[in-house]
Amino acid sequence: MLRLACLAPLAILIPAAGTAEQARPADDALAALGAQLFVDPALSRNATQSCATCHDPARAFTDPREGKAGLAVSVGDDGQSHGDRNTPTLGYAALVPAFHRDANGKYKGGQFWDGRADDLKQQAGQPMLNPVEMAMPDRAAVAARLRDDPAYRTGFEALFGKGVLDDPERAFDAAAEALAAYQATGEFSPFDSKYDRVMRGEEKFTPLEEFGYTVFITWNCRLCHMQRKQGVAERETFTNFEYHNIGLPVNETAREASGLGADHVDHGLLARPGIEDPAQSGRFKVPSLRNVAVTGPYMHNGVFTDLRTAILFYNKYTSRRPEAKINPETGAPWGEPEVARNLSLAELQSGLMLDDGRVDALVAFLETLTDRRYEPLLEESRAAQKD
């Protein structure tokens, strides 16, 4: 019988009351159960992978493991399977609205790069059943693993009623609800970065950070990476939750590792069940920029290693200079877009070219979006990008 970790470590996983803002109210007992599930590898087929394996709390809820494609995509429970997209951080995911279409007809919100999960609860359950992730065969198998541990039976029945783990549908739904509750705690969304401290008047930007902030709000960054077109929203998430096609090339190393083949096309939003409009092909959700300086590689397929490269990529749309057409990581021209139609040119072409000084400043500002507990990772990230 698979033995699951005891419930004692929960005290170190759940912040003490009042230590951080919560993204939304979460019942302490439910969140505590979710915290235990989050670190439990028994919820994967071979009992080798937990949620925390790919969303390491010590690494801003991203995957620190290297596979055949480096850090670009994650390795599955079997130690061989690879995904085709970069593992997104779960930080601030609870702030993402449910998937919907706004008054202007734009798709917004939802979880994952393609919004295939309506909300955090749906997101929490899907990796367990994904064959290239945790690879559990079905909900009944998940329920059986939960029943293997008496502590889980006690905890689930206290919250969801007697016999909950005997019903696969109820058990799976309850586990997803608990995981979502944990992800809605302040551990994931503390709003304690230097940026937040500056906004609260507790600290000041350096001159370079201040310049970077000015670049950010006056260039076209704000069009997609701020909730409002003007001004700063309280608890800013640095995303408008929309879907855009910015013309990224295929990450050929990741595509090969995934085994999907050279002819595969990642259609993004168009692949979401219920979306049939070809105009949505190639669109991916705008990610939050919180902790961006410590959560590389970048873009939905992890195609860029360096944050500077991710910024410089946008110059290809705003400058005719020869250097703007070259990927500094490869020394070769930027690859062709995987999906060349439906490019968000109105946003991409609205800015001006960023020179080296402005890129330096923008990187400095983006580093201020790092949660306090991840600030030590900044030096590590800077050193890695110099290698």
UniProtKB/Swiss-Prot annotation:
Entry coiled-coil feature ranges: none
A Pfam cross-reference name: CCP_MauG
Pathway: One-carbon metabolism; methylamine degradation
Record-listed E.C. numbers: 1.-.-.-
PROSITE patterns per record: CYTC
Major subcellular location class: periplasm
InterPro entries the record matches: Cyt_c-like_dom, Cyt_c-like_dom_sf, Cytochrome_c_Peroxidase/MauG, Di-haem_cyt_c_peroxidsae, MauG/Cytc_peroxidase
Binding-site residues, heme c 1: C51, C54, H55, H300
Keyword check for Membrane: no
Entry's localization field: Periplasm
Gene Ontology cellular component terms for the protein in this record: periplasmic space
Maturation and modification: Binds 2 heme c groups covalently per subunit.
Enzyme class, broadest EC rank: oxidoreductase
GO function terms (MF aspect): cytochrome-c peroxidase activity; electron transfer activity; heme binding; metal ion binding
Source species, domain of life: Bacteria
Keywords: Electron transport, Heme, Iron, Metal-binding, Oxidoreductase, Periplasm, Plasmid, Signal, Transport
Residues holding heme c 2: C221, C224, H225
Signal peptide location: 1-20
Role description: Involved in methylamine metabolism. Essential for the maturation of the beta subunit of MADH, presumably via a step in the biosynthesis of tryptophan tryptophylquinone (TTQ), the cofactor of MADH.
Record protein name field: Methylamine utilization protein MauG
Protein source organism: Paracoccus denitrificans (strain Pd 1222)
